[in-house]
Amino acid sequence: MRISIFGLGYVGAVCAGCLSARGHDVVGVDISSTKIDLINNGKSPIVEPGLEELLQKGISTGKLRGTTDFAEAIRATDLSMICVGTPSKKNGDLELDYIESVCREIGYVLRDKATRHTIVVRSTVLPGTVANVVIPILEDCSGKKAGVDFGVAVNPEFLRESTAIKDYDLPPMTVIGEFDKASGDVLQSLYEELDAPIIRKDIAVAEMIKYTCNVWHATKVTFANEIGNIAKAVGVDGREVMDVVCQDKALNLSQYYMRPGFAFGGSCLPKDVRALTYRASSLDVEAPLLNSLMRSNTSQVQNAFDMVASYDTRKVALLGLSFKAGTDDLRESPLVELAEMLIGKGFDLSIFDSNVEYARVHGANKDYIESKIPHVSSLLNSDFDQVINDSDVIILGNRDERFRALANKTPEGKRVIDLVGFMTNATSEDGRAEGICW
């Protein structure tokens, strides 16, 4: 394929070297004549192991060249990758001047280009940037229509400096955000020879995936550091702790706790978070991330309440009261907290949970109910159909399989709030079901 790459920094230079090495005809474009001279002489504009050899091969075989002439590069190619920087502004927002400038240059050339051209945003941009910035500029400057006259896609990169060549050749996945199927097809053809799954999504989803991955990596580093700091303060080697923690692939390093949804609860997690952060504080160990966990958890309960309150009705069914399906344990259940908030604000609440029957609650659960919701016996109803029929808003609170059907086929005249991810799609067909995170 004939490819032009705009921006020859870390991402652009690596892409130019790797794509030309795989037989594609690549034109590297940059406003810096110094970078272009380096490329055309087979020299790397950045320090990256193995890159200079790829660039030399590309130049010697005629598969790679560099230019400062934007228009010539666009006319000579079928696909353009935008790899320019998106640095931070002082307020933390992204500086999009470079992307906007490149899009204008591409758009002006597309106005007179007869063949279809595909524009791929490889730069890291916030969700909505392509839809609200890139496409409008391209359409305005070209006088053409995205998805009809030219293609648009997003292709987030997962390259790490110092291992970028290996990361390109052996990616964990290839993410394609496509404005239209034809654009996705063109981009997919570049990566089919790589041994990695190709995941095609909408553009905004692809934009968000990149940020989610990077923020998750930052979170893991911060988490490990805070655990290490606390461990050292109590005389433990934090490396030993994390080595063992990372051996658990069923829970610790898995999808199990990585599903967006409702707050955590139960007799362990809240208690243990509080205990560890208290100990850290008593030892004068700073743990900002860990200290934020309970606040964030409480905020998610508030989000669920706000969703209920947004509807013009007071009759609410809460399906599930225990913190998870298959147990009657109500200790620190976020659903109990939600029920308490609803009752306190005057909602007419009915609760169904087959595992929680007041007459059979003993010990800690009985004490917990009597201290948090003394009148819970009058709110619990073992008649599932009656609870549904007597409500206007139905909250799916835990993953009891009996609740699943309500997420995708909302009863007539009802609203459903899904806290657990039973909804098959982000929106229900009738528009009367809504997820807390989707």
UniProtKB/Swiss-Prot annotation:
Keyword ATP-binding attributed: no
Binding locations of NAD(+): 10-11, 30, 35, 86, 124, 271, 331
Enzyme Commission number(s): 1.1.1.132
Top-rank EC class of the record's enzyme: oxidoreductase
GO BP term, example: alginic acid biosynthetic process
Catalyzed reaction equations: GDP-alpha-D-mannose + 2 NAD(+) + H2O = GDP-alpha-D-mannuronate + 2 NADH + 3 H(+)
Residues that coordinate or bind GDP-alpha-D-mannuronate: 161, 210, 214, 217, 225, 256-257, 259, 262, 265, 324
Biological role stated in the UniProt entry: Catalyzes the oxidation of guanosine diphospho-D-mannose (GDP-D-mannose) to GDP-D-mannuronic acid, a precursor for alginate polymerization. The alginate layer causes a mucoid phenotype and provides a protective barrier against host immune defenses and antibiotics.
Similarity comment: Belongs to the UDP-glucose/GDP-mannose dehydrogenase family.
Name of the protein: GDP-mannose 6-dehydrogenase
Organism for this UniProt entry: Pseudomonas savastanoi pv. phaseolicola
Gene name, Swiss-Prot/TrEMBL: algD
